[in-house]
Amino acid sequence: MSSGKIAQVVGPVVDVVFASGDKLPEINNALIVYKNGDKSQKVVLEVALELGDGLVRTIAMESTDGLTRGLEVLDTGRAISVPVGKDTLGRVFNVLGDAIDLEEPFAEDAERQPIHKKAPSFDELSTSSEILETGIKVIDLLAPYLKGGKVGLFGGAGVGKTVLIQELIHNIAQEHGGISVFTGVGERTREGNDLYWEMKESGVIEKTAMVFGQMNEPPGARMRVALTGLTIAEYFRDVEGQDVLLFIDNIFRFTQAGSEVSALLGRMPSAVGYQPTLATEMGQLQERITSTKKGSVTSIQAIYVPADDYTDPAPATAFAHLDSTTNLERKLTQMGIYPAVDPLASSSRALTPEIVGDEHYEVATEVQRVLQRYRELQDIIAILGMDELSDEEKTLVGRARRIQFFLSQNFNVAETFTGQPGSYVPVEETVRGFKEILDGKHDQIPEDAFRMVGGIEDVIAKAEKMNY
């Protein structure tokens, strides 16, 4: 194990000099330095650049407070490695794979894997396009998720991103026996803590590994924590042959962290001050999220859009990798429609006859057409009232409102708050229900019977209770 000495500390960037003749650490190797020689105060550095004359530039994964020039630095000879396997489920980790949930620390001999890996090769990739059934009607019908696909989850504060994430984790665990990995990138510590306890109460945590690089941590940790979560997910895909769900919140903060260290590493800034390596860094992360012949990693990524500017390089670079988008709309929460997924703004590459089948595709496009026409008629209704519409338009509005309410449903993870049992609706049942509404089979049932229910049978049962 070769050793060097700290030559310079500039915020999260630390220069380390190695004696001439010593073997220099490789790029992405982990180095260890102890503050004041105290073994309990370890700081991990990751090699980013080799500057020549035995000098390497590194990024700190922890605070550099207390580091001084001249401190000894040890080369571990390998990249940052994190625990993998079934023992990670139900646990919370930081970027280095250290357990931070106050439970038993991981054994020293636990299996670990490096966070830096190559993306699967072409011959390992799965060529089939298979839908991942979520049991959530609005997603399965209008913006279905592909196994091994990437989903962008857009939404402001308080519109239900967290509950939607929890329900997806619950449904994958209950219906598919699947594993989920939640990665908080630049998360507020309070939000991460709330999510952990909510998931513990709902029983979802047993099928979930959680990794956090909080907002108060150095940019090095926030930049690498997504790779830590992805490494845990990849193990379940490649070794256990599982279909894994990987949540990243927020992918923008991954880019932001890279931008923070880029200038300190001596790189010229690119457009809007972002790092010139933005597309490469994003590609290295996103290309590892895919389906192989053994299993799949499906990622759901929350994406913050700065100043609602979709041309900003950070979200624009992420968009290039997405297969589906799920847009949450505040107006729908005000109408009491949950999940508040906008059926017209959300989209999916999987919504084609070749992947979902002809019937599903036709029903989905007709639902979108009816909702779009209803949106166009709303101005007329608001100004002149329903009486000014033709009989055909009145029928369309009635069906559109029933569709809008039928896109809502109770969630299993929200049962403790709502007092209503959650529902998991298979895709076939979802398609059949909406087809019957479009065909006018339920025009006589009151609109309220369609609100917050599961399948179409639940609507009929609810209507009978209402004595329509």
UniProtKB/Swiss-Prot annotation:
The keyword S-adenosyl-L-methionine does not apply. It catalyses: ATP + H2O + 4 H(+)(in) = ADP + phosphate + 5 H(+)(out). It is a peripheral membrane protein. Keywords: ATP synthesis, ATP-binding, Cell membrane, CF(1), Hydrogen ion transport, Ion transport, Membrane, Nucleotide-binding, Translocase, Transport. It comes from the Bacteria. It is found in: Cell membrane. One of its GO terms (cellular component) is plasma membrane. GO terms for molecular function: ATP binding; ATP hydrolysis activity; proton-transporting ATP synthase activity, rotational mechanism. InterPro entries: AAA+_ATPase, ATP-synt_VA_C, ATP_synth_F1_bsu, ATPase_a/bsu_AS, ATPase_alpha/beta_chains, ATPase_F1/V1/A1_a/bsu_N, ATPase_F1/V1/A1_a/bsu_N_sf, ATPase_F1/V1/A1_a/bsu_nucl-bd. Its main location: membrane. Coiled coil: none annotated. Its EC number is 7.1.2.2. ATP binds at residues 155-162. HAMAP family: ATP_synth_beta_bact. Produces ATP from ADP in the presence of a proton gradient across the membrane. The catalytic sites are hosted primarily by the beta subunits. Belongs to the ATPase alpha/beta chains family. F-type ATPases have 2 components, CF(1) - the catalytic core - and CF(0) - the membrane proton channel. CF(1) has five subunits: alpha(3), beta(3), gamma(1), delta(1), epsilon(1). CF(0) has three main subunits: a(1), b(2) and c(9-12). The alpha and beta chains form an alternating ring which encloses part of the gamma chain. CF(1) is attached to CF(0) by a central stalk formed by the gamma and epsilon chains, while a peripheral stalk is formed by the delta and b chains. NCBIfam families: atpD. This is ATP synthase subunit beta. It comes from Streptococcus agalactiae serotype V (strain ATCC BAA-611 / 2603 V/R). The gene is atpD.
